[in-house]
From Swiss-Prot:
E.C. code: 2.8.1.-
Protein's recorded name: tRNA-cytidine(32) 2-sulfurtransferase
GO cellular component, one term: cytoplasm
Catalysed reaction equations from the record: cytidine(32) in tRNA + S-sulfanyl-L-cysteinyl-[cysteine desulfurase] + AH2 + ATP = 2-thiocytidine(32) in tRNA + L-cysteinyl-[cysteine desulfurase] + A + AMP + diphosphate + H(+)
Top enzyme class: transferase
Organism: Legionella pneumophila (strain Lens)
Keyword Iron-sulfur: yes
One Pfam family of this chain: ATP_bind_3
Residues that hold [4Fe-4S] cluster according to the record: C112, C115, C203
Stated family: Belongs to the TtcA family.
Misc: The thiolation reaction likely consists of two steps: a first activation step by ATP to form an adenylated intermediate of the target base of tRNA, and a second nucleophilic substitution step of the sulfur (S) atom supplied by the hydrosulfide attached to the Fe-S cluster.
Function: Catalyzes the ATP-dependent 2-thiolation of cytidine in position 32 of tRNA, to form 2-thiocytidine (s(2)C32). The sulfur atoms are provided by the cysteine/cysteine desulfurase (IscS) system.
Protein encoded by which gene: ttcA
Amino acid sequence: MSSNPSSVEKKLLHYTGKAIADFNMIQRGDKVMVCLSGGKDSFTLLTILNQLRIKSGNKFEIFAFTLDQAQPGWNDACLRQWLAEKSIPHEILTRDTYSIVKEKIPEGKTYCSLCSRLRRGIIYRYAEENGFNKIALGHHRDDLVRTLMMSILYNGDIRSMPPKLLSDNKKHIVIRPLCYVQEKDIITFASEQAFPIIPCNLCGSQENLMRKKVASLIDQLAIENPKVPSNMLHALQSLKPSQLMDQNFWNFKNLEDGLETTQSIQCEEVFNAQEFELEDEKI
């Protein structure tokens, strides 16, 4: 911890440490690869994790990994200097995913999906080749609740970003230690620390992203009720399958079997779902 930490720094240390403890994100001997994109979130994550590492007595290792995707205007000189001053082990790897994205995605469409997929593959491969068993990402509380809202409104399912995830190849654990942290606190901390932020020129120019619309909607609701974002985060930890409609998680069809009655109940279906099917229609 800094010799004289600010109130927001103390807050970040508290909530990051709590998330790590709540979800058992980091254990003794872990080699944690922190994905440092050059944005405020990843700078904050790396800084706070490094302080927690020191506080733990170096019970785990951290390593900063930055992927240079060959975007026009990319300049990591200040980033390299900052990392050297902090004495944090790191590597900046260059892979031209920018050209692939520009070639595959039509002008005006969102690049994020393909860009993140290509980036994820490179990150997993690098972690495996270099012996890192944990991959730390800088998503914060507001990312989680916005993703939840986007999934409901645009995809028709209930999902978000889990605090801890087993990768698809079953070789890594992905962790999000900032999952309890509010974005406004990250903004304040980034300003205090004067991080050498590298803007994303690819995504930043696309103002029509759904995520920005959803963020604006949540912000508007929070004006009327400031607890809206925290309530949404709590909802991710408080699912009640019996109050939803997913038949994979709750046996609605055979609830009669749970009735406490002396009468014998025959649970024969009156209707068959196939009788009411319509082509190409979704409720």
